[in-house]
Amino acid sequence: FQLPPCQLINQTVSVEKEGCASCHPVETTICSGHCITKDPVIKIPFSKVYQHVCTYRDFYYKTFELPDCPPGVDPTVTYPVALSCHCGRCAMDTSDCTFESLQPDFCMNDIPFYY
């Protein structure tokens, strides 16, 4: 079994904005795949060990206008489009570095709220 290497893939992601009724799927490119990591057997206190993740090398932001926002709510949202990927430290400002992240097509608007 061979894991796919860190590479660009096409992905449908959901974009949404607080105040707008629903989320909308958009096509983009993201970074996905396996990076070789090492975990030292002997742990040295206070030493920094970084796990490499598949993350953006180059990207730009694309703008999408949500069609169902009420008056007074700015309907524009931006989302990243990956141009190239590499294995490196996780950049918290551009990547989801959590252990179990939400799926790219997850929508907060789909969660029922109970009052």
Swiss-Prot record:
The keyword Hydrolase does not apply. This is Gonadotropin subunit beta-2. It comes from Thunnus obesus (Bigeye tuna). Involved in gametogenesis and steroidogenesis. GO terms for cellular component: cytoplasm; extracellular space. It comes from the Eukaryota. Pfam families: Cys_knot (PF00007). Disulfide bonds join C6-C54, C20-C69, C23-C107, C31-C85, C35-C87, C90-C97. GO terms for biological process: G protein-coupled receptor signaling pathway; ovulation. It is found in: Secreted. Its main location: secreted. SMART domains: GHB. Heterodimer of an alpha and a beta chain.
